[in-house]
Regions:
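Non-catalytic, hydrophobic alpha-helical segments
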Residues: 84-85, 91
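A short C-terminal helix-loop "cap" of Rossmann-like NAD(P)-dependent dehydrogenase/epimerase domains
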Residues: 58-73
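Short, small/polar-rich loop/turn modules that mediate ligand/substrate recognition or access, typified
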Residues: 34, 39, 99-101
Length: 115
């Protein structure tokens, strides 16, 4: 799982570099492992409501913070872990047997607006 910070949208250059490296690794491993029938893809989630926010925010403030970010997403809501998991399950299925080396933006349309 990558992050959209790979495109330099993070205030942390180290974090952005690590995520960009993950994107490059995904593409290169896809090429290297294709002959063995192994597919390699990545998901790049937008803002997703997960327990990680409890590490740096008061629990009481998290719901309001997430709500304030709904309008940032073209689909009008912050993502859930289930949203990301469903995309991963799809990528693991035979329905995507011809997909490899792809970075999937799972972000309610944020990257579609920014490109």
């Amino acid at each position: 799982i990558g992050a959209q910070a790979a495109l330099g949208d993070s205030p942390s250059s180290a974090y952005s570099m690590a995520k960009a490296g993950l994107h490059a690794l995904t593409r290169n491993l896809a090429i290297e492992l294709a002959s063995a029938g192994i597919r390699v893809n990545a998901v790049s989630p937008g803002i997703v409501h997960t327990p990680i926010y409890e590490g740096f925010m008061d629990k009481a403030d998290i719901a309001d913070a997430m709500k304030s970010l709904n309008d940032f997403h073209p689909l009008g809501r912050v993502g859930t872990a289930e949203d990301v998991a469903n995309t991963i399950l799809f990528l693991l299925s035979d329905k995507t047997s011809w997909v490899t080396g792809a970075i999937w933006d799972v972000d309610a349309g944020i990257m579609a607006v920014r490109r």
